């Protein structure tokens, strides 16, 4: 057991949904402007997950007004209000950096089909 494990365990969130690269997420982020605080939603495709434990991060990419925007979030950050999984993507890679060079429909990710139970 490592020395920092008990300290790290106290900082871990338990409300993080299961998501993978290729999934489309809505990340609700707490933004503080002066004395006011509000929630801002950042929706995009997960192109990478990195690290582990308390230091785990994920990168989300979206196209806003024709410009690609990427943002890296720590999974267990207190500034994240909550995370919603919008759609599940069907991809074969862990890092989807190739999406940066694709435009329009070519950058679209196939949606994973849920198999019916029963």
Curated annotation (Swiss-Prot):
InterPro entries: Ribosomal_bL19, Ribosomal_bL19_CS, Ribosomal_bL19_sf, Translation_prot_SH3-like_sf
Keywords carried by this UniProt record: Ribonucleoprotein, Ribosomal protein
Xref: Pfam families: Ribosomal_L19
Transmembrane segments: none
Disulfides per UniProt: none
GO molecular function: structural constituent of ribosome
GO cellular component, one term: cytosolic large ribosomal subunit
Gene3D superfamilies: 2.30.30.790
GO biological process: translation
Role: This protein is located at the 30S-50S ribosomal subunit interface and may play a role in the structure and function of the aminoacyl-tRNA binding site.
PANTHER family per UniProt: LARGE RIBOSOMAL SUBUNIT PROTEIN BL19M (PTHR15680:SF9), RIBOSOMAL PROTEIN L19 (PTHR15680)
Family note: Belongs to the bacterial ribosomal protein bL19 family.
Record-given protein name: Large ribosomal subunit protein bL19
Lineage: Bacteria, Bacillati, Actinomycetota, Actinomycetes, Micrococcales
